Design a protein with these regions (language model features):
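Cleavable N-terminal export/targeting peptides
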Residues: 1-34
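Short proline/glycine-enriched turn/loop segments at secondary-structure junctions
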Residues: 2-4, 218-220, 276-280
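Short glycine/proline- and aromatic-enriched beta-strand/turn motifs that initiate or cap beta-hairpins
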Residues: 25-71, 201, 280-285, 291-294
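Residues on the lipid-exposed face of transmembrane beta-strands in outer-membrane beta-barrel proteins
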Residues: 40-44, 64-74, 84-86, 130-138, ...
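Extracellular/periplasm-exposed beta-strand and loop segments of Gram-negative cell-envelope proteins
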Residues: 48-61, 89-127, 157-205, 237-249, ...
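Short N-terminal amphipathic alpha-helices
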Residues: 75-85, 91-95
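Extended, basic/helix-rich recognition subdomains
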Residues: 213-215, 222-243, 258
């Protein structure tokens, strides 16, 4: 993951500095000093929810951000910027064929062993955050400039969802007193089912952020920024419930309403012990950003 981020950043910087050098070779006219910039921007690239797993595999995802902001320059080369942006983070989790068993009771309070076989499970997660950045920007040159910015961001989760509806799950119930395993009674929650989809809950995120690139002065007071950015999440945003959910939930009142919870907020039972799928969730983004200011 870190190697991929470095690769994306290096490619972006080579492109940006090459472009900036080409512009710098042209004759520059001194531009009037601007102390205020209002900007619209967008960017994209690697934008993922990162987490470690106790079983299965996690894969990073791609996303982006859009927003508007304001820069105030104390002097020509140094300024402070803030704004509001919407950022999307994605990730996926996959798990090969796996079996889960646990004791529970049915609608008649009869004890049985719930057995489930999960085939080619895949879960996609998507989070949209409202982010507020605070960045210090340093820039060089007059007309065509290089710039670097560093600071932090606060992210408030607005929309967080998961979807595992394509997964295939085969359930059965073993009743020890009868010494019989029920496999096709879907009204009892036994048989073939699909995964689920739904909403998730995450905590507020805190980032350390950096951006570097070229700033091109255009006509009519417009300025174009093209740069590479990195947003690195500092805290664990997992919002663990007081009572952890089971990955597979048997609803004894409505057995056919079988539910598969997200791996981000659930645990699984194996050999009488419970284990969480994930231990820490942090957002991470790296990509190319374009800003237009006036």
């Amino acid at each position: 993951m870190k190697h991929l981020i470095r690769k994306i950043t290096v490619i972006g910087l080579v492109f940006l500095f090459g472009t900036g050098s080409l512009f710098a070779q042209k004759k520059q006219k001194k531009a009037p000093e601007k102390r205020h910039e209002i900007m619209l921007y967008g960017g994209g690239g690697l934008s993922s929810l990162q987490y470690s797993v106790s079983m299965g595999k996690q894969a990073f995802g791609f996303g982006g951000q859009i927003g508007f902001g304001y820069n105030f320059f104390f002097i020509r080369k140094l300024g402070l910027g803030t704004g509001v942006e919407f950022a999307m983070y994605t990730a996926s989790f996959t798990m090969d064929n796996s079996s889960i068993r646990f004791k529970t009771t049915d609608i008649e309070n009869s004890v049985f062993e719930f057995r489930s076989t999960i085939n080619d499970y895949k879960e996609n997660q998507t989070a949209v955050l409202l982010q507020v950045p605070l960045m210090i920007q340093f820039q060089t040159g007059v007309k065509h400039q290089f710039y670097a910015a560093a600071g932090g961001k606060v992210g408030l989760p607005l929309i967080v969802k998961y979807n595992s509806s394509r997964a295939t799950i085969q359930n059965s119930g073993y009743y020890e007193e009868e010494d019989y395993e029920y496999t096709t009674q879907t009204f009892m929650g036994f048989g073939k089912f699909r995964g689920s989809s739904g909403d998730l809950s995450l905590k507020m995120a805190f980032f350390i952020s950096a951006e570097v690139g070229a700033k091109l002065i255009m006509r009519d007071g417009y300025t174009l920024y093209v740069g590479a950015y990195v947003d690195y999440g500092l805290n664990d945003i997992a919002n663990s419930p007081s009572e952890p959910k089971q990955f597979l939930e048997y609803n004894k009142k409505h057995p056919s309403d079988f539910r598969v919870n997200s791996v981000l907020e659930s645990q699984y039972s194996q050999n009488g012990a419970s284990q969480s799928f994930t231990s820490k969730i942090t957002p991470l983004a790296s990509g190319i950003k374009v800003r237009l200011t006036f």
